[in-house]
Amino acid sequence: MYKNRRNSLINHLPKNSALIIPGADLQYRNADSSYNLRQESSFYYFSGFCEPSSLMVLVNNGSSIDSIIFVPEKDKLKEIWDGYRAGPEGAVKDFLFDQAFENHKSDNLVPEILQGLDKVFYSIGKKSGFDQKVIDWTCAANSKDRHSRSIDIIDGSSLVGNLRLIKDDYEIETMKKACDISAQSFVEVMKSIKPGDNEQEIEALFLYEFAKRGGRFPAYTPIVAGGEGACVLHYIENDKELKNTDLILVDAGCEYKMYASDIT
């Protein structure tokens, strides 16, 4: 599925051009305590790969090698702490990329990949600090090939977005499942609410009901607002005790296989 999506994207690239899609990095709550990784949506859509600090480069230049991924290196010690890493070999074998390299090699190898191309597509402004890296890679590629015209950097958001706009059968069923999980969870939580409950208890019930049905994470921070809190559009304190006469507004939805649901 992911390889077919990549092939479709490559076929939509102009000849002699490339598309760069960076994955998400780990974000840290404090010290060495990180949040759960939520992979960048477009990166996951075309790769199926869910390790941090990865990078995908797709190329349309007539070569047999047109899908390249940079991934975290294999590291036995870090895998003891943080879990399995596919490494370059696993990225080729299990995710069907033509080539894969350790991500620390990207600064040297990406300019070589881009050398001689006419255009580089990249979604400008989506990942803080990464824009300059793409500019640096492109400048390095230009300096390696002074006899060719300079490479243009073009915003790739529309190119990627248009291919993702129309959902296939798998996506539609996945979206339906996400909505079903959330709808069933709403019903179960409504059965449990009583005066004296705290809003955070109700939030916890939603997270439990989502997870029990396969929605490991919420799609966004749930809003559980009793009484006047419901007048605050993005109320997320979720810490007040519910009175007997309170009405409760809940805005919550699970994420299932990277697809969100949203019910108020």
List each language-model region with its residue ranges.
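A broad detector of the eukaryotic-type serine/threonine protein kinase catalytic domain
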Residues: 161-164, 187-191, 228-229
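Secondary-structure boundary elements
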Residues: 15, 61, 113-115, 181-184, ...
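Short, well-ordered alpha-helical packing segments
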Residues: 10, 17, 26, 176, ...
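Short catalytic-site patches enriched in acidic/histidine residues
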Residues: 31-37, 143-144, 154-159, 197-264
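A composition/biophysics-driven feature that prefers long, compositionally simple stretches
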Residues: 1-184
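Active-site pocket-lining segments that scaffold enzyme catalytic pockets across diverse folds
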Residues: 167-214, 220
